[in-house]
UniProtKB/Swiss-Prot annotation:
UniProt-listed SUPFAM superfamilies: N-terminal nucleophile aminohydrolases (Ntn hydrolases)
Free-text function comment from the UniProt entry: Protease subunit of a proteasome-like degradation complex believed to be a general protein degrading machinery.
CDD domains reported for this sequence: protease_HslV
Activity modulation notes: Allosterically activated by HslU binding.
GO cellular component assignments: HslUV protease complex; proteasome core complex
EC number of the protein: 3.4.25.2
Protein name: ATP-dependent protease subunit HslV
Source superkingdom: Bacteria
Amino acid sequence: MGQESKPLIRSTTVLGVIRDGKAALGSDGQMTLGNTVLKHSTRKIRSLYHGRIITGFAGATADAVTLLDRFEEKLDAYGGKLERAAVELARDWRTDKYLRRLEAMLAVVSQDKALIISGTGDVIEPEDSIVAIGSGSMYALAAARSLLKHTPLSAREIVSESLKIAADICIYTNDHIVIEEL
């Protein structure tokens, strides 16, 4: 009682898949504040490091953009070495007084690595080369795992179909899908 509650921001499903040396990362476009849709076509992914890395974010947009800028600086500082840049960002994110207050997660793919970077200092490399973050991530992840295991679909097709499935289930995910490929 007496405490102001901040509106819960839920706005994203981001999914990345690597298959046969090709990587794809996509997201829906919905941004919500509480139970209201604010925007249908928010762009939550971008290409980094001379087009060799794609990243997407879930969480507060301003926080995520700040983290993306920092991640890009780390990639430049470490010559595009994805894991090293991710670990250094996670370390800074966790220990810096300003950064540790940022509320976002990053999903990152290159042609041979898929990582999730969190503000708690985690850098997670899933065993199946699928990364998923955001409100509908578990629906998209389940769909992607099944499609990867049981179909010959490309990475891009798996991302597209899985995000469509998540959009059919998760009220915080829509079907305005943007996908980038490597």
